[in-house]
Amino acid sequence: MQIPPFSLEAQISEIGQEIEEALLRVFRSGKYIGGEEVATFEKAFASVTETSYSVSCNSGTDALILALRSLNIGKGDEVITSSFSFFATAEAITSVGARPVFVDLSLIHI
């Protein structure tokens, strides 16, 4: 049996036209970072999550860097992180000047 790892079929059948129109607006505007569409998304996301603000990021790495900076983590700090993660986790930590400290995961220690 082969199970596809990811499928957007359900979303496309429901809101495909809306997604295509939004993508075309972004492509035509040339504003891939920032711009009206991003501001609209951030405002809607803040509303859905019942927060005052929302900041979107272009990647998980940038999101981690932003989170670390918001906590004033930097040079001289150590950040404990899982050794069972994508390399971008450690990259984000070193990008702010901190040192990643890797821990192993074990069911008997949880």
Where are these regions (language model features)?
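A short helix-loop-beta submotif of the ANL/AMP-binding
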Residues: 84-103
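Conserved PLP-binding active-site segment in aminotransferase class I/II-type PLP enzymes
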Residues: 1-70, 74, 96
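Conserved small/polar residues in nucleotide/adenosyl-binding loops
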Residues: 108-110
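Alpha-helix N-cap/helix-start capping motif
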Residues: 61, 83-84
